[in-house]
Amino acid sequence: MLNSRFPVSVKKSHSLRERKVFTTILQSKTRFFGTFINAYFIKNNHSTWRVAISIAKTKYKLAVQRNLIKRQIRSIFQQISNNLEPWDILVIVNKGFIELTFKEKQKLFLQLLKRIKEVDAYQTSANK
């Protein structure tokens, strides 16, 4: 029986794995640079959002730390998934992210969501 406190894992349809898509996202001009995360994003042709999380081994040597960060980020994306349009998002985690509280991490990703919505509104108005 599933415990209702813990969300079910992110669906495979919401994860990015193709190298070709990674390079396309990195070459896009839409990005968000923060102290603890950098995010690149691009509109996709799918009906859902997709996310990839990149954590360098040089910044977080222990796999336990890297996995904790990935789980927290996936959980945050799952919480805000109702507000997400179909975007491909590449999140690059910087040093110091693990020291933040979960609420601070949520705040960071809400800022990212706000930035994505601003870019979406700008691109929509520019295409008209």
Curated annotation (Swiss-Prot):
GO cellular component terms, alphabetically, are: ribonuclease P complex
Q: Which UniProt keywords apply?
A: Endonuclease, Hydrolase, Nuclease, RNA-binding, tRNA processing
Q: Which reaction does it catalyse?
A: Endonucleolytic cleavage of RNA, removing 5'-extranucleotides from tRNA precursor
What is the enzyme's main class?
Answer: hydrolase
Family, as annotated: Belongs to the RnpA family.
Q: Which HAMAP family match?
A: RNase_P
Q: What is this protein called?
A: Ribonuclease P protein component
Query: In the UniProt record, what gene is named as encoding this protein?
Result: rnpA
